[in-house]
A protein has these predicted regions:
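A Rossmann-like FAD-binding core segment of flavoenzymes
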Residues: 105-106, 142-145, 149-157, 163, ...
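N-terminal Rossmann-like FAD-binding beta1-loop-alpha1 element of flavoenzymes
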Residues: 37-64, 214-223
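FAD-site-proximal beta/loop scaffold in flavoenzymes
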Residues: 185-202, 289-364, 451-452, 467
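Beta1/beta-strand and adjacent pyrophosphate-binding region of the FAD-binding site
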Residues: 30-47, 201-211
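Flexible, glycine-rich terminal cap/loop adjacent to redox cofactors
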Residues: 7-12, 42-44, 56-68, 73, ...
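Glycine-rich dinucleotide-binding loop and its adjacent helix/turn
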Residues: 18-27, 79, 172-227, 231, ...
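Glycine-rich flavin
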Residues: 2-37, 53-60, 65-201, 234-238, ...
Length: 508
Protein backbone atom coordinates (compact mmCIF):
# COMPACT_ATOMS: atom_id res chain seq x y z
CA UNK A 1 0.00 0.00 0.00
CA UNK A 2 1.17 3.52 -0.72
CA UNK A 3 2.79 5.16 2.31
CA UNK A 4 0.97 8.12 3.88
CA UNK A 5 2.48 11.48 3.01
CA UNK A 6 1.69 12.99 6.39
CA UNK A 7 1.91 11.36 9.83
CA UNK A 8 -1.77 11.99 10.76
CA UNK A 9 -2.73 9.81 7.78
CA UNK A 10 -1.19 6.69 9.32
CA UNK A 11 -2.48 4.01 9.19
CA UNK A 12 -3.64 4.46 5.62
CA UNK A 13 -6.97 2.66 6.04
CA UNK A 14 -10.27 3.48 4.34
CA UNK A 15 -11.00 6.28 6.80
CA UNK A 16 -7.67 8.02 6.38
CA UNK A 17 -7.86 7.54 2.62
CA UNK A 18 -11.19 9.37 2.75
CA UNK A 19 -9.61 12.08 4.90
CA UNK A 20 -6.71 12.40 2.47
CA UNK A 21 -8.97 12.62 -0.56
CA UNK A 22 -10.74 15.56 1.05
CA UNK A 23 -8.01 17.60 2.71
CA UNK A 24 -4.82 16.55 0.88
CA UNK A 25 -5.81 15.05 -2.49
CA UNK A 26 -2.79 13.46 -4.16
CA UNK A 27 -3.56 14.50 -7.71
CA UNK A 28 -4.73 18.04 -7.07
CA UNK A 29 -3.97 20.44 -9.89
CA UNK A 30 -3.28 23.98 -8.78
CA UNK A 31 -5.08 26.70 -10.77
CA UNK A 32 -3.37 29.34 -12.88
CA UNK A 33 -3.44 32.78 -11.22
CA UNK A 34 -5.57 35.27 -13.13
CA UNK A 35 -5.19 38.84 -11.99
CA UNK A 36 -4.84 40.36 -8.56
CA UNK A 37 -6.52 38.74 -5.55
CA UNK A 38 -8.45 40.71 -2.96
CA UNK A 39 -7.10 38.27 -0.38
CA UNK A 40 -4.47 35.54 -0.41
CA UNK A 41 -4.62 33.26 2.62
CA UNK A 42 -1.58 31.23 3.65
CA UNK A 43 -2.64 28.33 5.84
CA UNK A 44 -5.71 26.13 5.67
CA UNK A 45 -6.47 25.73 9.35
CA UNK A 46 -9.42 27.29 11.14
CA UNK A 47 -8.36 30.93 10.72
CA UNK A 48 -7.47 30.48 7.07
CA UNK A 49 -10.61 28.55 6.16
CA UNK A 50 -12.95 30.97 7.93
CA UNK A 51 -11.27 33.98 6.32
CA UNK A 52 -11.28 32.41 2.86
CA UNK A 53 -14.89 31.25 2.96
CA UNK A 54 -16.18 34.45 4.55
CA UNK A 55 -14.35 36.70 2.09
CA UNK A 56 -15.42 34.70 -0.95
CA UNK A 57 -19.00 34.74 0.30
CA UNK A 58 -18.88 38.54 0.20
CA UNK A 59 -17.66 38.58 -3.38
CA UNK A 60 -13.90 38.80 -2.89
CA UNK A 61 -11.44 37.11 -5.23
CA UNK A 62 -9.61 34.74 -2.88
CA UNK A 63 -6.68 32.33 -3.03
CA UNK A 64 -6.08 29.72 -0.31
CA UNK A 65 -2.68 28.05 0.07
CA UNK A 66 -1.99 24.97 2.23
CA UNK A 67 1.25 22.98 2.29
CA UNK A 68 0.01 19.90 4.15
CA UNK A 69 -3.58 19.14 5.13
CA UNK A 70 -6.58 21.44 4.98
CA UNK A 71 -8.39 21.63 8.29
CA UNK A 72 -5.19 22.29 10.19
CA UNK A 73 -4.51 21.01 13.68
CA UNK A 74 -8.14 21.10 14.80
CA UNK A 75 -9.46 18.58 12.30
CA UNK A 76 -6.39 16.43 11.85
CA UNK A 77 -4.39 16.31 15.08
CA UNK A 78 -6.23 18.41 17.65
CA UNK A 79 -9.80 19.06 18.75
CA UNK A 80 -11.55 16.50 16.56
CA UNK A 81 -9.44 13.37 17.16
CA UNK A 82 -8.78 14.16 20.81
CA UNK A 83 -12.44 14.63 21.70
CA UNK A 84 -13.37 11.43 19.87
CA UNK A 85 -10.85 9.41 21.88
CA UNK A 86 -11.81 11.22 25.09
CA UNK A 87 -15.41 10.13 24.46
CA UNK A 88 -14.30 6.49 24.31
CA UNK A 89 -12.33 6.90 27.53
CA UNK A 90 -15.31 8.58 29.18
CA UNK A 91 -17.52 5.63 28.20
CA UNK A 92 -15.05 3.17 29.72
CA UNK A 93 -14.91 5.16 32.95
CA UNK A 94 -18.70 5.32 33.06
CA UNK A 95 -18.96 1.54 32.91
CA UNK A 96 -16.35 1.12 35.66
CA UNK A 97 -18.20 3.60 37.88
CA UNK A 98 -21.64 2.13 37.17
CA UNK A 99 -21.76 0.45 40.58
CA UNK A 100 -22.05 3.86 42.22
CA UNK A 101 -25.45 4.18 40.55
CA UNK A 102 -26.69 0.72 41.45
CA UNK A 103 -25.79 -0.78 38.09
CA UNK A 104 -23.74 -3.97 38.34
CA UNK A 105 -21.41 -4.90 35.49
CA UNK A 106 -20.17 -8.49 35.51
CA UNK A 107 -16.51 -9.08 34.78
CA UNK A 108 -13.68 -6.75 33.87
CA UNK A 109 -14.30 -3.83 31.56
CA UNK A 110 -12.40 -4.49 28.34
CA UNK A 111 -11.33 -1.68 26.05
CA UNK A 112 -10.56 -2.33 22.39
CA UNK A 113 -8.08 0.47 21.79
CA UNK A 114 -7.80 -0.32 18.09
CA UNK A 115 -11.57 -0.03 17.70
CA UNK A 116 -11.63 3.24 19.65
CA UNK A 117 -8.95 4.70 17.38
CA UNK A 118 -10.72 3.45 14.27
CA UNK A 119 -13.91 5.12 15.49
CA UNK A 120 -11.94 8.35 15.82
CA UNK A 121 -10.54 8.02 12.29
CA UNK A 122 -14.01 7.36 10.88
CA UNK A 123 -15.57 10.37 12.59
CA UNK A 124 -12.68 12.60 11.57
CA UNK A 125 -13.08 11.50 7.96
CA UNK A 126 -16.84 12.05 8.15
CA UNK A 127 -16.26 15.64 9.29
CA UNK A 128 -13.53 16.35 6.73
CA UNK A 129 -15.71 17.25 3.68
CA UNK A 130 -16.46 20.56 5.41
CA UNK A 131 -12.75 21.44 5.13
CA UNK A 132 -12.12 19.82 1.76
CA UNK A 133 -10.29 21.30 -1.20
CA UNK A 134 -13.31 20.61 -3.37
CA UNK A 135 -15.70 22.46 -1.07
CA UNK A 136 -13.56 25.58 -1.09
CA UNK A 137 -13.14 25.38 -4.85
CA UNK A 138 -16.92 25.18 -5.14
CA UNK A 139 -17.09 28.38 -3.08
CA UNK A 140 -15.18 30.12 -5.87
CA UNK A 141 -11.80 30.06 -4.12
CA UNK A 142 -8.54 29.25 -5.93
CA UNK A 143 -7.05 26.45 -3.81
CA UNK A 144 -3.30 25.89 -4.07
CA UNK A 145 -1.65 22.91 -2.38
CA UNK A 146 2.02 23.61 -1.81
CA UNK A 147 4.49 25.75 0.11
CA UNK A 148 4.03 29.51 -0.10
CA UNK A 149 6.75 32.13 0.08
CA UNK A 150 6.52 35.90 -0.08
CA UNK A 151 8.64 37.35 -2.87
CA UNK A 152 7.79 40.97 -2.17
CA UNK A 153 5.41 43.21 -0.23
CA UNK A 154 2.42 42.15 -2.35
CA UNK A 155 3.46 38.93 -4.11
CA UNK A 156 3.56 35.27 -3.11
CA UNK A 157 5.01 32.31 -4.95
CA UNK A 158 3.56 28.80 -4.73
CA UNK A 159 4.32 25.85 -6.99
CA UNK A 160 6.28 28.12 -9.33
CA UNK A 161 3.32 30.46 -9.74
CA UNK A 162 3.28 34.10 -8.63
CA UNK A 163 0.17 35.45 -6.93
CA UNK A 164 -0.39 39.20 -6.58
CA UNK A 165 -2.61 40.44 -3.78
CA UNK A 166 -4.23 43.53 -2.40
CA UNK A 167 -4.32 41.97 1.08
CA UNK A 168 -2.88 38.76 2.52
CA UNK A 169 -3.46 36.73 5.66
CA UNK A 170 -0.84 34.64 7.42
CA UNK A 171 -2.65 31.79 9.17
CA UNK A 172 0.03 29.12 9.34
CA UNK A 173 -0.65 28.04 12.91
CA UNK A 174 1.81 26.47 15.31
CA UNK A 175 3.46 23.12 15.93
CA UNK A 176 4.45 21.12 18.98
CA UNK A 177 7.52 22.55 20.71
CA UNK A 178 10.38 20.41 22.02
CA UNK A 179 11.47 21.31 25.56
CA UNK A 180 15.19 21.31 26.45
CA UNK A 181 15.27 17.93 28.19
CA UNK A 182 18.40 15.81 28.47
CA UNK A 183 18.23 12.95 25.99
CA UNK A 184 15.05 14.04 24.25
CA UNK A 185 16.79 14.17 20.88
CA UNK A 186 17.97 10.60 21.36
CA UNK A 187 14.60 8.94 21.91
CA UNK A 188 11.51 8.54 19.77
CA UNK A 189 8.62 10.48 21.22
CA UNK A 190 5.05 11.38 20.34
CA UNK A 191 3.42 14.79 20.04
CA UNK A 192 -0.19 15.76 19.42
CA UNK A 193 0.69 15.46 15.72
CA UNK A 194 1.56 11.75 15.99
CA UNK A 195 -0.23 10.31 19.02
CA UNK A 196 -3.51 9.82 17.14
CA UNK A 197 -1.79 7.52 14.66
CA UNK A 198 -1.37 4.86 17.34
CA UNK A 199 -3.21 1.60 16.69
CA UNK A 200 -2.13 -0.32 19.79
CA UNK A 201 -2.51 0.77 23.41
CA UNK A 202 0.87 1.48 25.02
CA UNK A 203 1.08 -0.61 28.21
CA UNK A 204 3.09 2.21 29.79
CA UNK A 205 3.07 5.81 28.60
CA UNK A 206 4.86 8.84 29.99
CA UNK A 207 3.49 12.31 29.34
CA UNK A 208 5.66 15.40 29.68
CA UNK A 209 3.64 18.52 30.46
CA UNK A 210 0.56 19.02 32.62
CA UNK A 211 -1.17 21.65 30.52
CA UNK A 212 -4.49 21.00 28.77
CA UNK A 213 -3.16 18.45 26.25
CA UNK A 214 -1.08 16.61 28.83
CA UNK A 215 -3.92 16.35 31.35
CA UNK A 216 -6.52 15.35 28.77
CA UNK A 217 -4.30 12.63 27.34
CA UNK A 218 -3.11 11.39 30.75
CA UNK A 219 -6.67 10.80 31.90
CA UNK A 220 -7.68 9.35 28.54
CA UNK A 221 -4.88 6.79 28.31
CA UNK A 222 -5.34 5.81 31.95
CA UNK A 223 -9.04 5.20 31.41
CA UNK A 224 -8.31 3.18 28.28
CA UNK A 225 -5.94 0.93 30.22
CA UNK A 226 -2.41 2.34 30.03
CA UNK A 227 -0.15 2.76 33.03
CA UNK A 228 0.35 6.53 32.88
CA UNK A 229 3.05 8.72 34.41
CA UNK A 230 2.52 12.47 34.10
CA UNK A 231 5.70 14.51 34.46
CA UNK A 232 4.82 18.01 35.64
CA UNK A 233 6.81 21.14 36.42
CA UNK A 234 7.02 22.52 39.94
CA UNK A 235 3.92 24.57 39.07
CA UNK A 236 1.81 21.42 39.12
CA UNK A 237 -1.28 20.46 37.14
CA UNK A 238 -2.84 23.07 34.82
CA UNK A 239 -0.51 25.82 36.05
CA UNK A 240 -2.25 28.56 34.06
CA UNK A 241 -5.58 27.91 35.76
CA UNK A 242 -6.70 28.73 39.30
CA UNK A 243 -4.70 26.69 41.84
CA UNK A 244 -7.79 25.00 43.29
CA UNK A 245 -8.87 24.02 39.77
CA UNK A 246 -5.51 22.31 39.24
CA UNK A 247 -5.83 20.58 42.61
CA UNK A 248 -9.23 19.14 41.70
CA UNK A 249 -8.04 17.89 38.31
CA UNK A 250 -4.88 16.43 39.84
CA UNK A 251 -6.97 14.45 42.33
CA UNK A 252 -9.17 13.10 39.55
CA UNK A 253 -6.14 12.08 37.49
CA UNK A 254 -4.78 10.15 40.47
CA UNK A 255 -8.21 8.56 40.99
CA UNK A 256 -8.07 7.35 37.39
CA UNK A 257 -4.67 5.75 38.00
CA UNK A 258 -2.27 8.45 36.80
CA UNK A 259 1.04 8.77 38.65
CA UNK A 260 2.10 12.43 38.88
CA UNK A 261 5.79 13.29 39.28
CA UNK A 262 7.14 16.85 39.49
CA UNK A 263 10.35 16.12 37.55
CA UNK A 264 9.84 19.01 35.14
CA UNK A 265 13.03 20.29 33.54
CA UNK A 266 15.02 17.84 35.69
CA UNK A 267 13.83 14.93 33.57
CA UNK A 268 16.53 12.93 31.80
CA UNK A 269 15.67 10.46 29.04
CA UNK A 270 17.46 7.39 27.70
CA UNK A 271 16.55 4.60 25.30
CA UNK A 272 15.96 1.29 27.05
CA UNK A 273 15.52 -2.27 25.92
CA UNK A 274 12.79 -3.30 23.50
CA UNK A 275 12.13 0.24 22.38
CA UNK A 276 11.31 1.46 25.88
CA UNK A 277 12.37 4.80 27.32
CA UNK A 278 13.95 5.29 30.73
CA UNK A 279 12.92 8.49 32.52
CA UNK A 280 14.99 9.71 35.45
CA UNK A 281 14.95 12.72 37.73
CA UNK A 282 18.43 14.26 37.72
CA UNK A 283 17.91 15.45 41.29
CA UNK A 284 17.87 11.81 42.45
CA UNK A 285 20.18 9.86 40.13
CA UNK A 286 20.18 6.81 42.38
CA UNK A 287 16.42 6.33 42.17
CA UNK A 288 15.06 3.71 39.77
CA UNK A 289 14.02 4.96 36.36
CA UNK A 290 10.40 5.21 35.28
CA UNK A 291 10.29 2.96 32.22
CA UNK A 292 7.67 3.67 29.56
CA UNK A 293 6.86 2.20 26.17
CA UNK A 294 5.80 5.52 24.66
CA UNK A 295 6.51 9.12 25.56
CA UNK A 296 4.15 11.96 24.69
CA UNK A 297 5.64 15.45 24.84
CA UNK A 298 2.97 18.10 25.40
CA UNK A 299 4.91 21.21 26.40
CA UNK A 300 4.03 24.36 24.52
CA UNK A 301 3.65 25.34 20.89
CA UNK A 302 5.97 27.05 18.43
CA UNK A 303 4.53 29.36 15.71
CA UNK A 304 5.11 28.40 12.08
CA UNK A 305 6.99 31.45 10.81
CA UNK A 306 10.01 30.03 9.00
CA UNK A 307 10.43 29.39 5.28
CA UNK A 308 7.74 31.84 4.12
CA UNK A 309 9.94 34.76 3.11
CA UNK A 310 8.47 37.03 5.75
CA UNK A 311 11.57 39.20 5.52
CA UNK A 312 10.91 39.78 1.82
CA UNK A 313 7.43 41.03 2.67
CA UNK A 314 8.59 43.29 5.50
CA UNK A 315 6.73 41.26 8.13
CA UNK A 316 8.33 41.26 11.57
CA UNK A 317 8.26 38.09 13.66
CA UNK A 318 9.93 36.51 16.66
CA UNK A 319 9.74 33.53 19.01
CA UNK A 320 6.14 34.40 19.87
CA UNK A 321 5.15 34.48 16.21
CA UNK A 322 4.17 37.17 13.74
CA UNK A 323 3.95 40.63 15.27
CA UNK A 324 0.51 42.23 14.92
CA UNK A 325 -1.29 45.29 16.23
CA UNK A 326 -4.74 45.27 17.79
CA UNK A 327 -6.29 45.23 14.30
CA UNK A 328 -4.27 42.08 13.46
CA UNK A 329 -2.12 43.98 10.96
CA UNK A 330 1.52 43.03 10.62
CA UNK A 331 4.34 45.51 10.05
CA UNK A 332 3.34 45.34 6.37
CA UNK A 333 -0.09 47.00 6.47
CA UNK A 334 -1.24 44.95 3.48
CA UNK A 335 -0.69 41.74 5.41
CA UNK A 336 -2.63 40.44 8.41
CA UNK A 337 -2.19 37.44 10.69
CA UNK A 338 -4.66 35.36 12.69
CA UNK A 339 -4.69 32.23 14.81
CA UNK A 340 -1.91 30.41 16.59
CA UNK A 341 0.82 32.04 14.50
CA UNK A 342 0.31 35.38 16.25
CA UNK A 343 -1.86 34.92 19.33
CA UNK A 344 -1.53 33.60 22.87
CA UNK A 345 -5.13 32.42 22.55
CA UNK A 346 -4.33 29.18 20.74
CA UNK A 347 -7.85 27.85 20.37
CA UNK A 348 -9.97 26.99 17.35
CA UNK A 349 -12.76 29.35 18.35
CA UNK A 350 -10.28 32.19 18.87
CA UNK A 351 -8.83 31.62 15.40
CA UNK A 352 -12.37 31.66 13.98
CA UNK A 353 -13.20 35.08 15.42
CA UNK A 354 -9.79 36.52 14.66
CA UNK A 355 -10.42 35.58 11.03
CA UNK A 356 -13.75 37.41 11.13
CA UNK A 357 -11.92 40.45 12.47
CA UNK A 358 -9.47 40.24 9.56
CA UNK A 359 -12.30 40.12 7.00
CA UNK A 360 -13.80 43.32 8.37
CA UNK A 361 -10.50 45.14 8.67
CA UNK A 362 -8.69 43.95 5.54
CA UNK A 363 -11.52 44.04 3.01
CA UNK A 364 -13.86 46.70 4.36
CA UNK A 365 -11.51 49.11 6.15
CA UNK A 366 -13.01 48.17 9.50
CA UNK A 367 -11.46 48.98 12.86
CA UNK A 368 -12.37 45.86 14.81
CA UNK A 369 -9.93 45.11 17.60
CA UNK A 370 -8.57 41.82 18.83
CA UNK A 371 -8.78 43.19 22.37
CA UNK A 372 -12.54 43.52 21.93
CA UNK A 373 -13.03 39.76 21.68
CA UNK A 374 -14.28 37.84 24.71
CA UNK A 375 -12.47 34.51 24.39
CA UNK A 376 -13.29 31.61 26.73
CA UNK A 377 -11.38 28.34 26.81
CA UNK A 378 -11.85 24.87 28.23
CA UNK A 379 -9.84 21.80 29.15
CA UNK A 380 -11.80 18.60 28.51
CA UNK A 381 -10.79 16.51 31.47
CA UNK A 382 -13.36 15.00 33.84
CA UNK A 383 -14.42 17.33 35.34
CA UNK A 384 -13.81 20.03 32.75
CA UNK A 385 -12.11 23.33 33.50
CA UNK A 386 -13.22 26.50 31.70
CA UNK A 387 -12.23 30.13 31.99
CA UNK A 388 -12.95 33.50 30.43
CA UNK A 389 -11.29 36.84 31.05
CA UNK A 390 -7.89 37.67 32.55
CA UNK A 391 -5.91 34.62 33.68
CA UNK A 392 -5.81 33.46 37.27
CA UNK A 393 -2.39 35.06 37.80
CA UNK A 394 -3.55 38.34 36.26
CA UNK A 395 -6.63 38.34 38.46
CA UNK A 396 -4.56 37.65 41.55
CA UNK A 397 -2.25 40.57 40.80
CA UNK A 398 -5.28 42.87 40.44
CA UNK A 399 -7.48 41.39 43.16
CA UNK A 400 -8.24 44.78 44.69
CA UNK A 401 -10.14 45.64 41.49
CA UNK A 402 -12.63 42.76 41.73
CA UNK A 403 -15.23 41.13 43.91
CA UNK A 404 -15.54 37.37 43.49
CA UNK A 405 -18.47 35.06 44.05
CA UNK A 406 -17.97 31.30 44.31
CA UNK A 407 -20.61 28.58 44.21
CA UNK A 408 -19.47 25.05 45.03
CA UNK A 409 -20.97 22.37 42.81
CA UNK A 410 -21.76 20.45 46.01
CA UNK A 411 -24.56 23.00 46.54
CA UNK A 412 -26.08 22.40 43.09
CA UNK A 413 -28.79 19.73 43.13
CA UNK A 414 -28.15 18.37 39.62
CA UNK A 415 -24.47 17.90 40.40
CA UNK A 416 -25.39 16.10 43.63
CA UNK A 417 -27.81 13.78 41.84
CA UNK A 418 -25.25 12.84 39.18
CA UNK A 419 -22.30 12.49 41.54
CA UNK A 420 -20.41 15.43 40.06
CA UNK A 421 -19.91 17.59 43.13
CA UNK A 422 -16.19 18.25 42.70
CA UNK A 423 -15.91 21.74 41.26
CA UNK A 424 -17.15 25.28 41.47
CA UNK A 425 -18.34 28.35 39.60
CA UNK A 426 -16.36 31.50 40.39
CA UNK A 427 -17.33 34.82 38.84
CA UNK A 428 -15.35 38.04 39.15
CA UNK A 429 -17.08 41.41 38.86
CA UNK A 430 -15.69 44.92 38.78
CA UNK A 431 -15.63 46.19 42.33
CA UNK A 432 -18.67 48.30 43.09
CA UNK A 433 -20.69 47.02 40.12
CA UNK A 434 -22.11 43.81 38.67
CA UNK A 435 -20.02 43.99 35.47
CA UNK A 436 -18.55 40.55 34.85
CA UNK A 437 -14.81 40.62 34.20
CA UNK A 438 -13.86 36.94 34.41
CA UNK A 439 -15.00 33.49 35.45
CA UNK A 440 -13.58 30.07 36.21
CA UNK A 441 -15.74 26.95 36.17
CA UNK A 442 -14.79 23.42 37.20
CA UNK A 443 -17.69 21.10 36.47
CA UNK A 444 -18.87 18.17 34.40
CA UNK A 445 -19.86 20.43 31.50
CA UNK A 446 -17.80 23.52 32.28
CA UNK A 447 -17.05 24.07 28.59
CA UNK A 448 -20.77 24.52 27.95
CA UNK A 449 -21.48 26.50 31.12
CA UNK A 450 -18.77 29.08 30.42
CA UNK A 451 -20.64 30.12 27.26
CA UNK A 452 -23.39 31.61 29.43
CA UNK A 453 -20.82 33.82 31.12
CA UNK A 454 -18.98 34.84 27.94
CA UNK A 455 -22.31 35.66 26.29
CA UNK A 456 -23.21 37.89 29.24
CA UNK A 457 -19.82 39.61 29.04
CA UNK A 458 -20.20 40.18 25.29
CA UNK A 459 -23.72 41.58 25.68
CA UNK A 460 -22.91 43.67 28.74
CA UNK A 461 -25.27 41.71 30.99
CA UNK A 462 -24.34 42.05 34.65
CA UNK A 463 -24.27 39.37 37.32
CA UNK A 464 -27.23 40.99 39.06
CA UNK A 465 -29.31 40.54 35.90
CA UNK A 466 -28.24 36.89 35.65
CA UNK A 467 -29.70 36.39 39.13
CA UNK A 468 -33.10 37.13 37.63
CA UNK A 469 -32.71 34.58 34.84
CA UNK A 470 -34.82 31.46 35.41
CA UNK A 471 -33.07 28.14 34.76
CA UNK A 472 -34.88 24.82 34.48
CA UNK A 473 -34.62 22.73 37.63
CA UNK A 474 -32.50 20.75 38.16
CA UNK A 475 -29.64 21.83 35.89
CA UNK A 476 -25.99 22.63 36.44
CA UNK A 477 -26.71 26.02 34.87
CA UNK A 478 -28.33 26.98 38.18
CA UNK A 479 -24.81 27.37 39.55
CA UNK A 480 -24.35 30.57 37.55
CA UNK A 481 -27.67 31.97 38.72
CA UNK A 482 -26.66 31.13 42.30
CA UNK A 483 -23.54 33.26 41.82
CA UNK A 484 -25.88 36.07 40.82
CA UNK A 485 -27.84 35.54 44.03
CA UNK A 486 -24.62 35.88 46.02
CA UNK A 487 -23.95 39.20 44.31
CA UNK A 488 -27.45 40.51 45.02
CA UNK A 489 -27.07 39.66 48.70
CA UNK A 490 -24.15 42.08 48.92
CA UNK A 491 -26.59 44.89 48.18
CA UNK A 492 -28.44 44.05 51.40
CA UNK A 493 -26.25 46.32 53.53
CA UNK A 494 -26.89 46.67 57.28
CA UNK A 495 -28.58 50.01 56.60
CA UNK A 496 -30.90 48.52 53.95
CA UNK A 497 -31.63 45.53 56.19
CA UNK A 498 -32.59 47.91 59.00
CA UNK A 499 -34.97 49.78 56.69
CA UNK A 500 -36.57 46.49 55.63
CA UNK A 501 -37.07 45.45 59.24
CA UNK A 502 -38.68 48.78 60.08
CA UNK A 503 -40.99 48.54 57.08
CA UNK A 504 -42.02 44.98 57.91
CA UNK A 505 -42.66 45.92 61.53
CA UNK A 506 -44.81 48.84 60.41
CA UNK A 507 -46.82 46.74 57.92
CA UNK A 508 -47.29 43.77 60.26
Amino acid sequence: MTEPRFEPLAPLDEHNLKLESNVAPRHWKNPEPSGKYNLVVIGGGTAGLVAAAGSAGMGAKVALIERQMLGGDCLNVGCVPSKAVIASAHAAAGVRDAGKFGVEVDGEVKVDFGAAMERMRKLRADISPHDSAQRFTDLGIDVYLGSASFTGPNTIEVDGKTLTFSKALIATGARAAAPPLDGLDEVEYLTNETVFSLTELPPRIGIVGAGPIGCEMAQTFARLGSEVTLFTSSSGVLPKEAPDAGTIIGAHLVHDGVTILDSGSNLSLKSGGGGSIECRDKRDPGAPAVVVDKLLVAVGRAPNVNGMGLEEAGVAFGKSGVEVNDYLQTTNKRIYAAGDVCSRFQFTHAADFMARTVIRNALFKGRSKMSGLVIPWATYTSPEVAHVGPTSKELDSRKDEFDEFTVDMSSVDRAILEGDTDGFVRIFVKKGSDKIEAATIVAKNAGDLISQVSQAMTAGIGLGTIAGTISPYPTQGESIRKAGDLYNRTKLTPFVAKLFRKWLEWTR
